[in-house]
């Protein structure tokens, strides 16, 4: 443990300071902006008119949309209850329209609009002219607007998304029979990209095999040097030109480690793919624990030296090799098994419409529990999440859309599926995080013809070492297995002993017993016993059947498998919504708000205690966590999760014992520490009936349960529990993970309210309703109609989603119980700040703030004197409440005696 780093954190917190925030970055249409005068990415998310229905003629430039709602993107068309499974979301056409006046300075430039994702099939018009029709929900749409724009006057972009069921494009399966939800809308970012008529193309805007944009790959990698190959596709829409292509590669510290210049002549209205290569000496290599990213600067100049295009890409120098029974080799060296989870992108209430910071926090929350591989179930993820995986050192299994469906009747379905294969590789080929290409629809009976073409197209798009395709290793696909590099299975496959194995989904215990009941599927509010059961199931699940011992795919099974199985992903990281089933999937180690369950700490026990200094926001520190609440309904056994060597458990000041967190009979590096039959509710009652609420040292020593984490014989961390007492107050936490909210009109910050006792213990068994209000440069998402505000406490928690305005500044969040009273818990307030966006926002109008409910005691027009008197009265009421509560406590003590 780095004690100096830990001490610095404590000192900074004591003096009200913060550690300097790591500046995470998000790509824009596949690049990072350097000089906006040459190539600029303009944030086009703010100020779209929207209506959730079909409207005839809404593509026309003069259509009257004045009564439509104004929204900011990403937008999912609607807000939904926490439990939104079973197809409760809207399916059908909707419309978005944006009015804008292009800057006169853009005359003569190329102007592209880049949609990161529109759900379903969609049509896009500019000034009444149809410019693109698209079929598919998860890939960018890159459209040239240059010839359609009118400068000096208002322009209108109209978009008609339609998320209705449609068998003709992937995933193809109707939502009501699908194990995830479509949701809808323009649910990812939109960018306006401007550059000159000589420019580096976008790989999805040009149909070039292994071409378009920038393509980087590596060869001859050692610790001493690596050969870097860079292909740059340049378009020239002007006169023939002699050009210079400049490359500069810089390391994390900004040191230039290589540079290169190449001359090329491109004819008028033509393009050229320029192939370049150079050697980097003593390269900083990318790996999960050391995710070094280099900056590749690409600059196009004319023969006079004028810059015509410039931007940068992030490059992670690494090679992967899968050697079947020998396992995974990263940068030429054997690498340990990878362990992680699948990820669906939907979030509580907002569906798929997550802003970039929420995507980043998703990746960060998983990385902070030690995960180093993610499977993108069952579609390609938002670029912000992919950027985070590159940055945080998380391998990724990239998947095309699909789930248990193949359209045999319409050939267009396979054509579009194969187009998705090419698009996925073109889009993500440069990412160091990409581990496998899942180019088949999940759990689907696809024809052999498709297997041949899908693997062939992948090889064509990535014709270099390090490309690995993957499919299921099931009997009905035995003919197709030979075409793929990797198989999904529990362990080595007898018929394919030389193939590498990956476990795509493990942990979920589905046998269709009474319609998908499973020990893995636990809603957090069900309590500690179900949560403990879920965690222990994920660790190891065995049972007897017909006289034979059966083992379900678990953490124990994964670590105990042969070297052929080089990685595995849990189903699933977060609770998420489903189409065909009315219950959400509750098997996540975190809920839909990304708040942890006990199983979260099972995974965190695999986090090392040092060695992650190069991973942003991730501290490899010792921890210990007691998965027990000391309630009258708590189990007798006490389970503790830790990444320390040993755990010492003390109860009521008496030592229970010391146990190791390792087991010579278990292949898992850390095991749950279980102290059996040590908790008795009568002891908790007797030890706490007097003096409770003082929270002084004497009481703490005599009343709590304490776990101490031990490394090399010394206590390095601890965690305490006590029986939660009377509800005293609400407590608020801004769950920003150290990622500063952006004032871009789209960012969402999670604020969690906890109901706690006098000492801060959370009252997990409470179910009051909590009402949130927001002041300043933010707005509360949702209200009564969508069951968001007020909100019932679940497991002692209520969560507010706060959307940033377009002005940087202070945001104040207040939480209070719905019904006031002399003995009601005290309200809570917390503040946080937003910072200005990194890109220019282009808009002409803003959404109106939703009308918030004003609590009765808060008078809208009250004077400063009245406000002062009201505050004083509240303080008097609070003191009176404390007095009464203490008197009640004394009476109870007397009665017990």
Description of each model-found segment:
Residues 39-59, 78, 118, 178-185, ...:
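Substrate-binding clefts and catalytic carboxylate motifs of secreted carbohydrate-active enzymes
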Residues 150-154, 231-323, 832:
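Extended acidic/polar, glycine-enriched regions
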Residues 75-115, 119-127, 132-135, 166, ...:
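Active-site-adjacent substrate/metal-binding segments within catalytic domains
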Residues 230-233, 299-300, 638-642, 747-764, ...:
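Beta-strand-rich structural segments
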Residues 106-109, 149-154, 240, 280-293, ...:
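Short glycine/proline/serine/threonine-rich loop/turn segments at secondary-structure transition edges
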Residues 361-365, 373-601, 619-627:
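Substrate-binding/catalytic cleft of secreted carbohydrate-active enzymes
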Residues 26, 30-35, 54, 91-207, ...:
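Accessory beta-strand-rich segments of carbohydrate-active enzymes
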Residues 25-52, 67-103, 114-116, 158-239, ...:
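Non-catalytic, glycine-rich low-complexity segments
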């Amino acid at each position: 443990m780095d004690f100096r780093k830990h001490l610095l954190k404590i000192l900074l917190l004591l003096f009200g300071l913060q550690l300097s925030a790591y500046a995470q970055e998000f790509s824009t249409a596949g690049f990072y902006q350097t000089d906006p005068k040459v190539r600029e990415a303009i944030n086009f998310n703010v100020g779209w008119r929207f209506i959730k229905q079909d409207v005839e003629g809404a593509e026309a430039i003069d259509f009257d949309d004045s009564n439509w709602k104004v929204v900011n993107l990403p937008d999912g068309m609607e807000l939904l209850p926490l439990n939104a499974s079973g197809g409760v979301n809207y399916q059908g056409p909707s419309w978005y329209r944006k009015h804008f006046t292009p800057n006169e300075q853009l005359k003569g430039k190329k102007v592209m609009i880049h949609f990161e994702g529109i759900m379903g099939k969609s049509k896009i018009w500019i000034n009444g002219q149809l410019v693109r029709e698209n079929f598919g929900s998860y890939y960018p749409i890159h459209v040239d607007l240059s010839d359609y724009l009118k400068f000096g006057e208002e322009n209108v972009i109209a978009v008609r998304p339609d998320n209705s069921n449609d068998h003709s494009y992937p995933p193809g399966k109707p939502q009501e029979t699908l194990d995830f939800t479509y949701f809808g809308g323009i649910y990812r970012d939109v960018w306006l990209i401007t550059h000159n008529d000589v420019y580096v193309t976008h790989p999805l805007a040009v149909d070039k095999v292994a071409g378009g944009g920038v393509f980087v790959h590596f060869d001859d990698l050692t610790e001493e040097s690596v050969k870097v190959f860079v292909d740059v596709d340049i378009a020239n829409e002007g006169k023939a030109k002699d050009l210079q292509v400049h490359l500069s590669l810089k390391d994390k510290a900004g040191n230039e480690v290589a540079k290169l210049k190449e001359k090329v002549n491109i004819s008028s209205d033509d393009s050229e793919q320029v192939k370049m290569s150079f050697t980097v000496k003593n390269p900083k290599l990318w790996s999960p624990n050391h995710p070094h990213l280099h900056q590749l600067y690409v600059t196009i100049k004319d023969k006079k030296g004028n810059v015509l295009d410039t931007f940068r890409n992030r490059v992670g120098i690494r090679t992967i090799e899968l050697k079947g029974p020998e396992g995974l080799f990263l940068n030429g060296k054997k690498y340990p098994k990878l362990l992680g989870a699948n990820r669906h992108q939907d979030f509580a209430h907002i569906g798929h419409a997550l802003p970039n910071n929420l995507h980043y926090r998703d990746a960060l929350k998983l990385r902070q529990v030690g995960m180093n591989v993610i499977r993108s179930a069952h579609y390609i993820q938002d670029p912000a999440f992919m950027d985070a995986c590159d940055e945080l050192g998380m391998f990724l299994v990239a998947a095309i859309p699909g789930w248990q469906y193949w359209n045999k009747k319409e050939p267009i379905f396979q054509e579009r599926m194969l187009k998705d294969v090419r698009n996925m590789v073109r889009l993500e080929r440069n990412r160091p995080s990409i581990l496998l290409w899942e180019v088949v629809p999940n759990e689907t009976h696809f024809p052999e013809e498709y297997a041949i073409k899908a693997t062939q197209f992948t090889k064509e798009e990535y014709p270099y070492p390090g490309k690995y395709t993957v499919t299921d290793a099931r009997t009905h696909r035995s003919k197709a297995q030979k075409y793929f590099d990797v198989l999904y299975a529990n362990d080595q496959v007898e018929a394919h002993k030389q193939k590498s194995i990956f476990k795509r989904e493990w942990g979920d215990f589905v046998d269709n017993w009474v319609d998908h009941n499973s020990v893995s599927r636990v809603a957090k509010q069900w309590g500690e016993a179900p949560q403990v059961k879920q965690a222990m199931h994920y660790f190891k699940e065995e049972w007897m059947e017909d006289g034979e011992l059966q083992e379900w795919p678990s953490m124990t099974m994964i670590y105990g498998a042969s070297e052929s199985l080089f990685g595995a992903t849990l189903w699933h990281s977060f609770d998420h919504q489903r189409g065909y089933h009315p219950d959400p999937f509750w098997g996540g180690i975190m809920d839909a708000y990304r708040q942890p369950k006990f199983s979260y700490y099972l995974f965190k026990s695999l986090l090392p205690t040092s060695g992650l200094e190069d991973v942003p926001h991730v501290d490899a520190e010792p921890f210990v966590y007691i998965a027990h609440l000391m309630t009258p309904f708590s189990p007798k056994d006490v389970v503790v999760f830790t990444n320390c060597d040993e755990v010492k458990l003390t109860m009521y000041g008496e030592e229970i014992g010391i146990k190791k967190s390792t087991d010579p009979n278990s292949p898992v590096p850390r095991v749950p520490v279980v102290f059996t039959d040590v908790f008795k509710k009568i002891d908790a009652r007797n030890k706490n009936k007097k003096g409770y609420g003082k929270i002084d040292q004497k009481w703490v020593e005599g009343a709590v349960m304490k776990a101490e984490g031990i490394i090399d014989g010394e206590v390095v961390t601890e965690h305490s529990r006590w029986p939660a007492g009377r509800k005293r107050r609400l407590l608020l936490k801004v769950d920003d993970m150290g990622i500063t909210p952006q004032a871009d009109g789209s960012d969402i910050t999670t604020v969690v309210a906890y109901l706690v006792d006098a000492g801060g213990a959370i009252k997990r068994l409470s179910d009051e309703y909590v009402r949130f209000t927001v002041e300043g440069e933010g707005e509360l998402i949702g209200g009564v109609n969508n069951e968001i505000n007020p909100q019932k406490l679940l497991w002692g928690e209520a969560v507010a989603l706060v959307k940033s305005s377009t002005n940087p500044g202070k945001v104040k969040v207040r939480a209070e119980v719905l019904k006031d009273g002399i003995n009601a818990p005290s309200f809570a307030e917390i503040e946080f700040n937003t910072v200005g966006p990194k890109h220019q926002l282009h808009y002409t109008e803003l959404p109106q703030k939703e009308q918030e409910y004003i609590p009765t005691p808060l008078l809208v027009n009250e004077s400063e004197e009245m406000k002062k008197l009201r505050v004083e009265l509240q303080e008097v009421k609070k003191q009176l409440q404390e007095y009464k509560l203490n008197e009640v406590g004394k009476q109870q003590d007397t009665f017990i005696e």
